[in-house]
Design a protein with these regions (language model features):
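Non-catalytic cap/lid and distal C-terminal segments of serine-dependent acyl enzymes
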Residues: 20-330
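Bacterial N-terminal signal peptides that target proteins for export
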Residues: 1-8
Length: 330
């Protein structure tokens, strides 16, 4: 546990240089809940010029920290988000990060802790009642790093009716569909007591599968159509999390589900690559919130498509309409 807290500190330090001169507001509150033990320390960021009475609600970005981290991680993340806003990568947004320990943001099998329920019920309710943020799916976004990448991906995959998009960075997931197939490479950093405290003792393999993003995507891909999905991992990840990320990417690709995937050359699990990668993730959110209207229908694109469609006709290949929610597979 102490070692993982040290790694979380490294992540925070990597983001700290941007934290100086924060123009928005960052506060810490405690949210009471019966779903988890005690109250939850939570960091909330509002952007420069935040107007609680603005006619248009602000997008809400839920951020989930990594294992060993806490809401203190928001210090650096808020500054990097503010940089993304100032660069025009993403609209001015409100963001929130709860402290969740090493819970995996899971509803525990034995019912003693319900972190997923806390996020979907208590956290969302707190933000929507107390801040001028989106109260519907559109404009409600979720992201996270490492354990938070796993949590954000799982929660969004299980509840695509709640979230417009998810940006999962180096998610702590394994490249398997069944628990019994997990290899030592993908679990050396998770001890059995931790897994059993969350998934049951012994681990309830069906419960694990029901909460595994890869299995969810494989078994029910149609539920993900229309969900903005962004996946990121460094190819030098010390926890080998790029293998699990690539696995989910391949499932989504083979199922024809539109998504964006980045395997970042030379990037590690922690360190200076996190800032530019987080900015890329926020740029993805920006494109989801304000889709470019000419990427598929600009005049030059239409002209080129007309020519290519003629090639298809001559070859007897079917011509299907463009659907940005799906990969062009046929």
């Amino acid at each position: 546990m102490k070692d993982l807290r040290f790694l979380a500190l490294i992540c925070i330090t990597a983001l700290m240089p941007a934290a100086y001169g924060l123009e928005g507001k960052l506060i810490h509150v405690s949210i009471a809940s019966t779903n988890v033990p005690g109250s939850v320390d939570t960091a909330i960021y509002t952007p420069p010029g935040y107007d609680p009475n603005r006619a248009e609600a602000y997008p809400l970005i839920i951020q989930l920290h990594g294992g060993g981290g806490s809401s203190a991680n928001m210090t650096g993340m808020a500054a990097t988000l503010e940089s993304a806003i100032q660069q025009g990568l993403v609209p001015a947004s409100v963001s929130v990060m709860p402290s969740a320990g090493r819970s995996f943001y899971m509803d525990y099998r034995d019912g003693t802790q319900k972190w997923e329920t806390f996020i979907l019920a208590d956290l969302l309710s707190h933000m929507r009642s107390g801040y001028n943020v989106s109260k519907v799916r559109e404009g409600t976004l979720i992201t996270g790093i490492s354990m938070g990448g796993m949590g954000s991906l799982r929660i969004a995959f299980k509840h695509p009716e709640t979230f417009q998009a998810v940006a999962s960075m180096e998610p702590g997931i394994e490249p398997v569909l069944q628990y019994k197939d997990i290899q030592l490479r993908d679990r050396f950093w998770r001890d059995d007591p931790l897994m059993e405290s969350i998934y049951g003792k012994p681990v309830d393999e069906a419960y694990w599968a029901a909460n595994n993003p890869a299995t969810i995507a494989n078994d029910n891909p149609e539920s993900l159509v229309g969900l903005g999905i962004y996946l990121d991992a460094g190819d030098q990840d010390m926890f080998f999390l790029h293998h699990g990320t690539e696995f989910v990417h391949r499932i989504l690709f083979d199922q024809g589900i539109s998504h964006e995937y980045r395997l970042v050359r030379g990037a590690e699990h922690v360190g200076p690559s996190i800032v530019p990668r987080f900015l890329d993730a926020m740029a993805f959110f920006g494109r989801v919130l304000n889709p470019p209207d000419n990427w598929t229908n600009a005049p030059a694109v239409e002209q080129s498509r007309t020519l290519v469609d003629n090639f298809k006709r001559r070859a007897g290949y079917p011509i299907n309409p463009v659907d940005p929610r799906r990969l062009r597979t046929e």
